[in-house]
Design a protein with these regions (language model features):
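C-terminal motif of bacterial Sec signal peptides marking the signal peptidase cleavage site
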Residues: 16-18
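Bacterial signal peptide processing site
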Residues: 20-22
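N-terminal low-complexity, Pro/Thr/Ser-rich intrinsically disordered segments
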Residues: 26-53
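Extended, small/polar residue-biased N-terminal targeting/export presequences
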Residues: 52, 67-186, 243-245, 251-273
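PDZ/PDZ-like domain segments forming the peptide/carboxylate-binding groove
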Residues: 104-108, 165-215, 219-223, 294, ...
Length: 471
């Protein structure tokens, strides 16, 4: 999964959850009838072929709505698209004399006209490749934004045997998440080890939390402390079906062995599908929020209220590890149970015109101490929450630095072939107007997990949080 595919997954989650984000400024509208893009009114219809007209619509959609469109050099998008086109020709053993990049002047409309003319001349000579060339061209143009919240969702296939709640893949999680391995590898640190056995081939092979993965398909996951592309093979997505060979070490016994795992569907633990889980830990309310889906803040607050009934709590531990984000509105609502009258986040244009996301002061204050657990899987709206907790001194963060994937809330746009383009209309900053994207939010107490912790079922970050609340 590339950065684009990670963003695509986020876009799909956004659409499935009907998450609303601020309406973007129109800026420059599309240049022709039918070229204006708009948020989808509902689920898209059947997907049709990607054509040069769809690429044109996406090009002007970006220039009219992307948060930095006013300062964006559109020639970079066209150049990236043309590079991808010529590379795809080469991969298919073809080339076309007319496939030469036209001179671009910086006039967005004129440059598009020049690009389109050459594109049509090129693709007309290879009609059998027309669909492939269109797809790679648009993919490259979106990727040229270099934005972890920009994506183009298309050709999404689902395993025909899939049922709601099924897991798919090898059936494991490691200390390097799928998003880190494929789109944010710089944040990964060795060793690579199993943290959760979810089911599927991994469970059948007898792997356990704490097992160290020494190689993936014969390649080391880290070289000189830096992650390699081999880790991505742990997270195949349908229709990827090639077996994955792992070399493993169980440190408690010294055993080394190899297994070959085949991706597939598997039944997941129903508890793992719950967005909000809670339990009482002595006199502390522990609440895990896996994502900021609609109504997640209300569910979390109801859980705390239930745990508080008939007893005095000494505080709240909010576990946001692995929370991939969701609605910034939900994040702000949950924050509002701990502080009122504050700016929690800023959404800005490229010229630094910003609007704040305020606390919802209709939410009743809990009046309880707060500790938040974070890790590199805490992304987007989760980082909005974590940065506000730290900046506004609402509580303390324990664990590891967050993902650094907070470009801004994704706004979806429906293209004419029923595919979905998504990108931020405004850029996100923390409560102190600091940059979080690509950097993440540092914890107040750095408590990483180890293979030994995973093997023994220990949670050192949670233990630290409970200790802090009991001081």
């Amino acid at each position: 999964m590339t950065v684009s595919r990670i963003a695509t997954a986020g876009l799909a989650l956004l659409l499935a959850a009907a998450c609303t984000v601020p309406t973007p400024p129109r800026g420059q509208a599309g240049t022709a009838a039918g070229m204006v893009c708009a948020p989808p009114p509902g689920p898209p219809g059947p997907e049709t072929a990607t054509t040069i007209d769809v690429i044109e619509q996406a090009y002007f959609c970006i220039l009219g709505n992307y948060y930095s469109a006013a300062t964006l050099d559109a020639r970079q998008l066209l150049a990236a698209g043309f590079i991808a086109l010529t590379q795809e020709l080469n991969r298919n053993g073809r080339d076309v004399p007319e496939a030469t990049m036209p001179a671009l002047t910086g006039d967005r409309k004129a440059d598009w006209a020049a690009f389109e003319a050459v594109y049509r001349k090129t693709t007309d000579q290879v009609p059998g490749l027309r669909d492939k060339l269109a797809v790679v061209t648009l993919e490259a143009m979106v990727a040229a934004l270099d934005d972890n919240h920009a994506s183009w969702a298309h050709d999404i296939k689902r395993n025909p045997g899939y049922y709601d709640g099924d897991g798919e893949g090898l059936g494991l999680q490691t200390n390097v998440t799928g998003s880190q391995a494929t789109g944010n590898p710089g944040v990964a640190v060795p060793p690579l080890f199993v943290t959760t056995v979810q089911g599927g081939a991994v469970k059948a092979a007898g792997l356990r939390p704490g097992d160290v993965i020494e190689s993936v398909n014969g390649s080391a996951p880290f070289i000189d402390g830096k992650p390699t592309s081999a880790i991505a093979a742990l997270y195949p997505q349908y229709p990827e079906a090639r077996p994955v060979k792992l070399r493993l070490l169980r440190q408690s016994t010294g055993r080394r062995w190899s297994v070959t795992l085949k991706p597939g569907l598997y039944q997941r633990d129903l508890a793992a599908l719950q967005v909000v889980q809670s339990k009482l830990m002595d006199d502390t309310a522990y609440v895990r929020v896996r994502g900021f889906a609609p109504d997640s803040a209300t569910r979390a607050l109801r859980a705390i209220s239930r745990l508080r009934t008939g007893r005095t709590l000494n505080g709240v531990v909010l576990d946001l590890r692995g929370n991939g984000g969701g609605s910034p509105t939900e994040a702000a609502r949950l924050l509002s149970a701990f502080v009122h009258g504050k700016d929690t986040h800023y959404l800005c244009t490229a010229d630094s015109r910003c609007e704040s996301v305020r606390t919802d002061d209709t939410v009743e204050l809990l009046g309880l101490p707060l500790v938040v657990l974070t890790d590199r899987g805490c992304a987007s709206a989760c980082e909005h929450f974590g940065s506000a907790v730290k900046d506004l001194r609402i509580g303390r963060l324990v664990g590891t630095r967050t993902a650094g994937l907070m470009a801004g809330p994704t706004q979806p746009y429906l293209l004419s072939n029923n595919t979905m383009l998504g990108f931020p209309s405004r850029h996100g900053l923390g409560a102190n107007r600091e940059e979080i994207n690509r950097i993440g939010v540092a914890p107040d107490h750095h408590v990483p997990s180890t293979p030994q912790d995973a093997a023994a079922g220990r949670d050192p970050a949670l233990a630290k949080a409970l200790t802090l609340l009991h001081k």
